[in-house]
Curated annotation (Swiss-Prot):
HAMAP family: Dephospho_CoA_kinase. The keyword Cytoplasm applies. Belongs to the CoaE family. The keyword Acyltransferase does not apply. This is Dephospho-CoA kinase. The lineage of its organism: Bacteria, Pseudomonadati, Bacteroidota, Bacteroidia, Bacteroidales. The gene is coaE. Its EC number is 2.7.1.24. Keywords: ATP-binding, Coenzyme A biosynthesis, Cytoplasm, Kinase, Nucleotide-binding, Transferase. It comes from Bacteroides fragilis (strain YCH46). InterPro entries: Depp_CoAkinase (IPR001977), P-loop_NTPase (IPR027417).
Length: 205
């Protein structure tokens, strides 16, 4: 049975870079943001519920209007809870199906910016936090999303603080542009194999 890790971190922290490096090293990672978009696009029940909540224009032309949904989602914590209540249960089920086909592997991962807030943390065995200084995160996100600083800060304020995520994490990766990532990821993999060895020993005893 594979050990499941949850990779999280704030906007612009570099979660995707860490996930990509893990995949290069042979650890498959379920990218919840990408997979949730696929689930939303193909599940007629979700589409109807989102249209009822946000308005028909959220699926204008038959495609999800990601900008409109994001604007609604980040407008208030109530809106976020409403949207997440529609999408997250389906994504959890999809992740369970995905991971059930990878039981022969030692380590698999799930990447989610809201791993803890969404309840996805309940689906994994340990949490890996990707940390970057706030100023650097904002700079990265503004450049990547072509958004304003205020828009990015609004999204950051809507999520759990880095400090709280670090407290909940079993392992923290620093992605500040100075500390090399690969040695940290190799250290993470070694840490996970120690955990696997411990679990196997405990099971045999």
């Amino acid at each position: 049975m594979a050990i499941k890790i949850g990779i999280t971190g704030g906007i612009g922290s570099g979660k995707s870079v860490v996930s990509h490096l893990l995949e290069v090293m042979g650890v498959p990672v379920y990218i919840s943001d990408e997979e949730s978009k696929k689930v939303v696009a193909t599940d007629p029940v979700i589409r109807k519920e989102l249209c009822d909540l946000v308005g028909e224009e959220v699926f204008s032309g038959g495609k999800l209007n990601k900008t409109l949904l994001a604007t609604y989602l980040f407008a208030s914590s109530t809106h976020a809870s409403q949207v997440n209540g529609i999408i997250h249960p389906r994504v959890k089920e999809h992740f369970r199906q995905w991971s059930s086909h990878k039981e022969c592997l030692d380590i698999i991962g799930m990447e989610s910016a809201i791993l803890i807030e969404s309840g996805f943390a309940d689906e994994v065995d340990c949490i890996v936090m990707v940390y970057a200084p706030l100023e650097l995160r904002v700079e990265r996100a503004v450049r990547r999303d072509n958004a304003s600083c205020e828009q990015i800060m609004q999204r950051i304020r809507s999520q759990m603080s880095d400090e709280e995520k670090c407290e909940r994490a079993s392992f923290v990766i620093i992605n500040d542009g100075e500390k090399p990532l690969i040695p940290q990821i190799l250290e993470l993999i070694a840490f996970l194999y120690q955990k696997i060895h411990y679990l196997c020993s405990a099971k045999n005893n």
